[in-house]
């Protein structure tokens, strides 16, 4: 308000108006009488010039709220602030209004288009509202209407920086109606009308009895907010409110015209209910009068400046002040109307508009309604005016020019499709603007966050360092639409800016090529590849691109010879004064009020460590509120580059680096001192001032890293989740104190890993599943733990290899309780068994950590070198001593606690691995196992110490047990004794016996050659039998056989056997002789609970069949088969073996077909097959013991006798022969011998003979004269190995 206002009744306005107490013929006494008369209120003298109460609220909170800064973002809910007494203040749980409609002076509020509202008496003070500034645009008042001091103003341009405040759509007549529409339930449970006001009057800060005067009014820096309660709804057409007693900002001179907002429960949004009129003091409380929003008055002014033209699909021509409407687009004289300058032309229902002259609409613009298409043609003529307003879902195809000496303002949610180069600047507040020409506009200004620029041609932006596009407060969107775009810098002032590519089929490259430090505050998303490449032979460390907004793309990011930083953004706050204090002479000007304010709040800032609240800086390195930047991409490619992730950044994506430095959790952060204010020069220039300092906050990275000749540093408060495979070649990595790295995928490094923080290595969790695949982790130079806070963890199906070194009291954790161990993915069960030995975690390496603590739970440690530990605690775990070249190993522990665990030590006849405990050994239910890597039968007389511990150690800490090693059960003989200085567990001998179960499993595996031979034998004679059934001729044939078999010991197999061949018929005296050749392929799979694998076989053979006229026949066949085998065994540590073998076959069958009738027969038969099966041998080590398993070459001889019966059925054009058979197959020779050898000796297992009953049924059919088809089912029974089911299908084509 202008100075201090009293209230006076006005006959002209029909209500109260505010009149300066300094005005002529008005006195405080006169005013008091008027107020007492009209309002029945007692006004106690003049109102004190006091407004912002900072006794319990920081000054900055009032300013942040009005300027929508800090936590007070539009729409924010559950907002609370901390008061200076430490209490919380919640604003009655109201959401935060959008105050962007407030002009910079605070004395007027935009309501959309070219209109704003204020109070009429502000006209006396041009600073208040005669010229209104929004962001970088200034607007002049060109006309007004007012009533009861409420004033609606028309501006010379459409306001692009804001869509404006939403006006109240209704004016309740009573308080109860208003309470229903605008009331909210307050924190005390009562329903009240609570609202906000934003203005910038003559600001003073009150702290108790002291006052800090700013001597400033209408300053945008000091735009502040009030929280109020409406106490009277209607008083001479106005409402009355009082300020909140805690968040207390009393209106003062200069606040006149500022907007008052209430939450509309029906619309569910904040609405502008009026403008601030005047103040009065009643019983010591200040009351504020709000002149209500006058929708009728607003509509009258808008109607005055609107010229509506219904095109209805037709066209109009505009020349000078004449507008001519042509019906049905006919180019004839039509209806003419006069255009009044400064009026808005409102087009409806679509159509064409043709300019036939240069048009200057003054403060008038062109408005297009919703949902239609318009074509604007200019024939080289220009338009100039307030701007263009396009309704929702309307398209305006702009083929005219805008005047180059003015700036086009575009608002409305519709689309402006610009088809011609304009040679002018544009400011965009809402909707889409499509650019179809190179350099369509000289410069583009985007504001409010509601506008979008769409590129529809290469180079459609400018060619300067900013590409001629500027994003002011809340910015807007640039859609590359499949076009590449290069910037030196993007002129964006906040995260309201978004650069996207909506073309899902064509990637757009966004290149940012700054060679000096630059911060981009906006967002990047869509189908975009981001690059920051500097053309240089050397790395340009000054070419630092800093992203503190967000990236969300499935494409790559590329950086070469430059630096890239991803970080959060220090939240901007209000400042008290942006300009410097121009008076440095304290004795003349007094102490600068900004300094006084800072000193006033210093004690509270010291208490709460909150100097940043009073330092007159919009951002500070020490402030706690940083916006988290989220950055998602596919792969970041670094070449001779630096990449850092600083505080409050969350990065997701893979990294591929070459000769680069990667820092995750970088302490160096960057602040743009002009953030939010970067855009200058009426909106078409950009300034940035960057400060850098140290500031630590949480940093996250999720992805995998591949790096060559690079370096990686993980800093304090960084959380790194390596869920992608990580391969580091000649790339050291360090993990600082306070950092956490979680490797959820395999990790390999040719260097070491330095750990001062925490490293966790795990298996690979499967997406959308609770199962886990084992993860492999390997560090060639080991893991180096530094300091007492270093933490090394391996769990959740992790297999880790690499020595561990710790120089202090670090913590090393291996495994986790069995109850927490996840399910292993079914596809990796066998692999997990090999890697983890049935434990949760496996570790291979030595641990040198004389001050550290190692904890093992459900883990196995393969100890392969000398190790020393301060404290070792194990549960449900195993420590297994291993080593190369027969070297024995010693584990030295100061304090050892073991429960339900096992120690496996190796021993020969003279030496052994040793466990040395210096201070304490305790525990129960533990096994002491011995791997005998050298034995010579039962042996006594050994004297080898395995464990030594302090004197008095309980004798039952360990117990010896029998171990299955190789094909033997070995039992160590261990003597426990307590000498004068120590307790020892000494190996004095061992006993070994054959392990029948291991031998059985080995024999079952080695019998695979015999079973493969048998499968081939069963299929040898199939072809010759077919020839007898079909009275065949010379021809070609094919057969496929699929079957399954089983044997004792859980053995089962399945196979698919394919035969192809051709034969020739020779008609001789008294017999038919068939000779032929065959090729075969067999794919078989076999397994048991002890092994599994497959055999692929290929073979070739010759056969002959002589069929005598008497019914007798003789079949002969010879065949060779080559086998490729791969089997994995789970016994005796055999693992997976690949080997080749072969076999020979020679078979003869004789029989006689006796015809019972012409179509039925009985056929007794006998077969003998002799063969050769190659042997095989495997040699390996199990737990240090040398093992050999082999079977020799052997020659099977297999006989078969049986009888077949059959009958033929025929018709005119068909014939089918059905048959059934029953036989017995038997071994004449025993199959091969298996030899097993381990350190306890040799075991020979003789082969056995087997026999089985064979059964089959089948048929052969003549499909055509020269085409035959056969099908047969068979199985066997009563053998040690049986064919459970087999099906045989064959085809023959006769020549």
From Swiss-Prot:
Enzyme class label: hydrolase
The Peptidase S6 domain, residue ranges: 51-300
Record EC number: 3.4.21.-
Name the UniProt record assigns to this protein: Serine protease sat autotransporter
Gene: sat
PROSITE patterns in UniProt: AUTOTRANSPORTER (PS51208), PEPTIDASE_S6 (PS51691)
Domain comment, as recorded: The signal peptide, cleaved at the inner membrane, guides the autotransporter protein to the periplasmic space. Then, insertion of the C-terminal translocator domain in the outer membrane forms a hydrophilic pore for the translocation of the passenger domain to the bacterial cell surface, with subsequent cleavage.
Signal peptide: 1-49
Cited InterPro entries: Autotransporte_beta (IPR005546), Autotransporte_beta_dom_sf (IPR036709), Autotransporter_pectin_lyase_C (IPR012332), ESPR (IPR024973), OM_autotransptr_brl_dom (IPR006315), Pectin_lyase_fold/virulence (IPR011050), Peptidase_S6_dom (IPR030396)
Protein's UniProt keywords contain Oxidoreductase: no
Site feature location: Cleavage: 1018-1019
Example of a GO MF term: endopeptidase activity
Organism annotation: Escherichia coli O6:H1 (strain CFT073 / ATCC 700928 / UPEC)
One GO CC annotation: cell surface
Described purpose of this protein according to its UniProt entry: Shows serine protease activity and displays cytophatic activity, including elongation, rounding, and detachment of a proportion of the cells from monolayer in culture. Triggers vacuolation within the cytoplasm of the human bladder and kidney cells.
Autotransporter domain mapped to chain residues: 1029-1295
Effect listed in the UniProt record for changing residue 352 to N: In strain: Nissle 1917
